Structures are given as C-alpha cells and as structure tokens.
C-alpha cells in the first residue's frame, strides 16, 4: 500500500482494466487495482523472500515472485464481484464482503504455495487464519497512518 502511494513509476499507476466497463455498466475491477500495485506486490514478495531465505538468489527470488503473484491475482475475483454488486472500490459491502476482502489474497497464496512448498492441511489452515488476521491488522494500521480510507 505504501509503495502504491509513492510518486514512483507513475506509468504503472493505471487501472488494470484501463477503465473498461462490462455490459452491466460497471468497471471490470475498478480504479484501485493498478498495474503498479499488482507488479509491486510481486516484486516486494520476491525481494522479501530473497532477504528471508538467503539461498540462491534465483531460487528465493522466483519463489517469492510466484507467491506475490498468487497473492495479487487472488484479489482480482473479489474486485470483479464487488463491481457487479455495485460496491465502490475501496469500500466493503458488509461483514461477508469484509471477510473476503481480507481473505481473498490469502486464499490464493494458500492454494498456490503447495507448488513450491508442500503443506499439511493443518499448516494451510494456520497460514489462512494467521494470514487473514494479519491482513486485517495491517489494514487497520494503514488506516491510522492515513494510508487507507477505512479500517477493514
């Protein structure tokens, strides 16, 4: 989120759907899903993985990039559904939608993580619970830092 707010790589700050609307008149993903955020998450995860694992650069960097891709791509279906439900980008549509706003990317991460790291069901459940809770807590902190407009 901080990266997206910085005045860097402005050419990537365009919405992924480029303003395209479907037959229902709504945007595909909305203004908040930008190439800068999508690619930034992949790069952030790749660099973080390399810094944490300190194995061969290519191994760690590519593994992190894969997991960043999983995280970023999993946010898109939720954004698509929210547009169909006329929920404004950056807003939630009730408790169920708030849950999916926090859990969508974690679900993608847990589904694609086994490709690079085998998981037991208990590990997958733990990652899901801790990841979703962490996502919510970080969003609340971003709200108090005035980097997000709503808490959840």
Task: Please place each PLM-identified region on the residue numbering.
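Interhelical loop and helix-boundary elements at the membrane-water interface
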Residues: 1-49, 53-68, 72-111, 121-152
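Selective transmembrane helix interface/packing segments
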Residues: 115-116
